[in-house]
Amino acid sequence: MLVLSRKANESIMIGKDIEIKVLGIEDGKVKIGIDAPRGLEIYRREIYVEIEEENITASKQNLNLENLKILFKK
């Protein structure tokens, strides 16, 4: 893991088109801004983990294809 120190209003670049900027530091929290291509998906880690868990759960469910077939006929 690369560890960098930045002050408020300083930034780092990831490649040539992703910039992460420290917008401010207040009450022990760091506020960051991310400038990246529009199509790039960016999530907070806890949200990303939740999405992964939901996808795993959904992939393990047994689907009754007959019920699905009925739904599409409506």
UniProtKB/Swiss-Prot annotation:
Top-rank taxon of the source lineage equals Bacteria
Keywords for this protein: Bacterial flagellum biogenesis, Cytoplasm, Repressor, RNA-binding, Translation regulation
- The answer to whether UniProt assigns keyword Repressor to this entry is yes
Query: InterPro entries from the entry?
Result: CsrA, CsrA_sf
| Chief localisation class | cytoplasm
What the entry lists under Pfam families is as follows: CsrA
* Keyword Transferase among UniProt keywords: no
Q: Where in the cell is it found?
A: Cytoplasm
Give a GO molecular function annotation for the protein: mRNA 5'-UTR binding
Task: Extract one GO BP annotation from the record.
Answer: regulation of bacterial-type flagellum assembly
| Cellular component annotations (GO), alphabetically ordered | cytosol
**What HAMAP family does the record point to?**
CsrA (MF_00167)
- Please explain the role this protein plays, according to its UniProt record: A translational regulator that binds mRNA to regulate translation initiation and/or mRNA stability. Usually binds in the 5'-UTR at or near the Shine-Dalgarno sequence preventing ribosome-binding, thus repressing translation. Its main target seems to be the major flagellin gene, while its function is anatagonized by FliW.
User: Subunit composition?
Assistant: Homodimer; the beta-strands of each monomer intercalate to form a hydrophobic core, while the alpha-helices form wings that extend away from the core.
**Record family assignment:** Belongs to the CsrA/RsmA family.
Q: What is the designated name of this protein?
A: Translational regulator CsrA
Instruction: Give the organism the record lists.
Output: Alkaliphilus oremlandii (strain OhILAs)
